[in-house]
């Protein structure tokens, strides 16, 4: 298609089909909670409105009402005075303005052929004023609902991150290898998960988790008669209704989606022991970050049973595993029987990109470091005009380098098991970048130490060490039942092989701990004081490159 009007119609048809899925064939019976959550159900106060306005993110495109967040944030108190009556009326009548139920879909390209619609993600541009009310609802509900969610879920939750899940999985793989125990990992991928969730089931889930009826009716009203228009080139498509999924771009969407994922995994693991032994009484069944699920089991049959249960439970909510992207990793396994989703055999892999980081069957991070260097090099080369510019100051160039190149390079470095060889590769790349920014030729007699001083940089291994121990301090401050914190001391039931144990991330951390004259217990007490931890460990011991 070459004509813009034809392309616009095609995009509208694609998103119309995507956002209006058929209902699940077998709707689940989900009981209501015995009591509603104890949260404030009164109409929004001016203090809440001001707080929500201040929390709006700047730089976001305006929705159909053409009101950018900056216009509200310019004077939060005045904006709150204007909105107070409107939001109070909405709260009492439980009806959203029709304009708030319309959104514009902006297409963002993903991997793959950009000539195919399926390789784009749609993000909804919504009313900034509507997001003020959504934020108030979210702040009231989030804490109470969060306390009921499974500990394995780290997505969209306070004090949790991708790094926590990546580190936990790496430790599980490394310890399984060291203790010679079998481990099966199934990386589940869903097809268009946020767009496929059945809404009739979603409202049942909100009652199941005890959300008060006032909130449910207001949220449901914002989804009823919801319409979208697709932005393409310089035009807008015709309006169409949306009946499935949560609004991508809405503040409430991740919160609502977590209810669905939590129910699926609770039903999947209910009265089952198909995970790995985590402590004397509990098994670890999976690690989750929103819809990115890594099932773990100690034998093939357990993994097959759990995969089948997850598939059946997710289909009841309108979600379907993507069999072409769902992969299985086997560590220390002699059983060659495949794991299936329905009748489709899942591909077995020796490495997998989990939450943006490459996790390998040997537990190492060499492959991930190689990928990080390549991605950072691409990012650096894309900014070549910045580095060669005579207008941009050197200070600004280094700020751009840190935020756009080094951030890519060091993503997940907290979990890396670095070696002398990988450290040299990382440092060589950084040195190459610094020399290009500073316009220092290799023929110039400038040592690496002089280069780092000119750039205000530390050696890369020191930077990685600081990031690692800063993150470890955060983990040691979490509750004792935190899964990542427990992983720091977890050992599977098995027997080590004869000979010297291989190096691992955790063994390296424990070695550093002993060299500093500490134990996990003393580090745990030290970490409770953030200032002392930052001064003595992150900026003290790590800077000494111990």
Show where each model-derived region lies.
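Catalytic palm active-site di-aspartate
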Residues: 63, 102-105, 121, 153-155, ...
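Basic, alpha-helical interaction scaffolds
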Residues: 132, 344-417, 461, 467, ...
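Conserved catalytic palm subdomain of right-hand nucleotidyl-transferase polymerases, strongest
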Residues: 59-67, 105, 115-125, 163-207
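Catalytic palm subdomain of template-directed nucleic-acid polymerases
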Residues: 73, 192-209, 245-246, 289-316, ...
């Amino acid at each position: 298609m070459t004509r813009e009007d034809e392309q616009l119609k095609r995009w509208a048809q694609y998103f119309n089909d995507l956002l209006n899925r058929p209902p699940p064939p077998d709707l689940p019976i989900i009981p209501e909670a015995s009591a509603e959550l104890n949260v404030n159900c009164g109409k929004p106060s001016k203090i809440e409105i001001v707080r929500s306005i201040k929390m709006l993110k700047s730089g976001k495109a305006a929705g159909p009402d053409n009101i950018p967040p900056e216009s509200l944030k310019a004077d939060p108190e005045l904006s709150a005075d204007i909105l107070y009556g409107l939001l109070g009326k909405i709260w009492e009548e439980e009806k959203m303005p029709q304009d708030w139920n319309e959104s514009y879909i902006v297409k963002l390209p993903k991997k793959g052929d950009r000539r195919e619609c399926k390789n784009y993600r749609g993000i909804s541009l919504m009313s900034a004023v509507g997001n003020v009310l959504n934020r108030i609802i979210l702040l009231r509900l989030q804490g109470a609902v969060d306390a009921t969610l499974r500990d394995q879920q780290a997505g969209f939750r306070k004090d949790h991150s991708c790094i926590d899940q990546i580190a936990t999985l790496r430790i599980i793989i490394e310890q399984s290898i060291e203790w010679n125990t079998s481990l099966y990992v199934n990386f589940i991928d869903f097809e268009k998960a946020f767009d496929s969730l059945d809404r009739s089931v979603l409202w049942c889930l909100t009652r199941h988790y005890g959300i008060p009826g006032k909130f449910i009716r207001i949220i449901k009203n914002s989804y009823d008669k919801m319409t979208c228009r697709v932005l393409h080139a310089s035009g807008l498509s015709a309006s169409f209704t949306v009946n499935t999924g949560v609004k991508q771009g809405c503040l409430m969407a991740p919160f609502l989606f977590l209810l669905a994922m939590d129910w699926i995994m609770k039903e999947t693991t209910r009265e089952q022991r198909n995970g790995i032994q985590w402590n004397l009484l509990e098994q670890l069944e999976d690690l989750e970050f929103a819809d990115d699920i890594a099932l773990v089991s100690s034998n093939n049959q357990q993994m097959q049973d759990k995969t089948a249960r997850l598939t059946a439970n997710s289909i009841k909510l309108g979600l379907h595993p993507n069999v072409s992207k769902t992969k299985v990793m086997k560590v220390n396994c002699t059983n060659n029987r495949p794991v299936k989703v329905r009748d489709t055999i899942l591909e077995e892999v020796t490495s997998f990109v989990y939450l943006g980081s490459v996790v390998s069957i040997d537990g190492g991070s060499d492959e991930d470091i190689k990928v990080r260097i390549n991605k950072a090099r691409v990012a650096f080369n894309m900014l070549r005009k910045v580095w060669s510019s005579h207008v941009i100051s050197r200070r600004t160039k280094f700020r751009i380098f840190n935020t756009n190149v080094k951030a890519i390079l060091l993503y997940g470095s907290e979990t890396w098991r670095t070696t002398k060889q990988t450290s040299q590769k990382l440092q060589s790349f950084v040195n190459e970048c610094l020399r290009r920014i500073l316009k220092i030729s290799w023929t110039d007699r400038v040592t690496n130490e002089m280069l780092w001083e000119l750039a205000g940089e530390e050696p890369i291994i020191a930077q990685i060490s600081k990031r690692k121990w800063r993150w470890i301090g955060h983990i040691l401050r979490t509750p004792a039942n935190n899964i990542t914190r427990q992983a720091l001391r977890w050992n599977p039931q098995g027997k080590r092989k004869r000979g010297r144990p291989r190096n691992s991330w955790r063994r390296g951390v424990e070695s550093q701990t002993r060299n500093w004259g500490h134990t996990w217990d003393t580090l745990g007490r030290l970490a409770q004081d953030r200032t002392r931890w930052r001064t003595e460990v992150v900026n003290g011991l790590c800077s000494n490159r111990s």
